[in-house]
């Protein structure tokens, strides 16, 4: 089942901003049809994602302990949240350590 993901805008926020006191990257995405498919509704999604980005297994997420994000994936979490963790892990792998992320919906679907 093909899905489209569109980056609507992105910007780098230097120093304190409306999200955090640190510099941050703000990205607005249109998840399209992905918005209607939590992680637990896509067969094999969690295992394939963890095979591609194994560092996600250490993410705490809201559970507060290592593996918390994997628990959320298996229980079902939204794709915006999944992308947030993927971006955090990819930034860490690129030598730009971070642990902060927030996912918010807007008044427009997608």
Please give the residue ranges for each predicted region.
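Active-site-proximal helix-loop elements at catalytic-domain edges
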Residues: 19-58
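Charge-rich, well-structured scaffold segments of protease-associated domains
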Residues: 1-29, 89-95, 99-110
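M16/MPP (pitrilysin/insulinase) zinc-metallopeptidase core fold and M16-derived inactive scaffolds
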Residues: 46-110
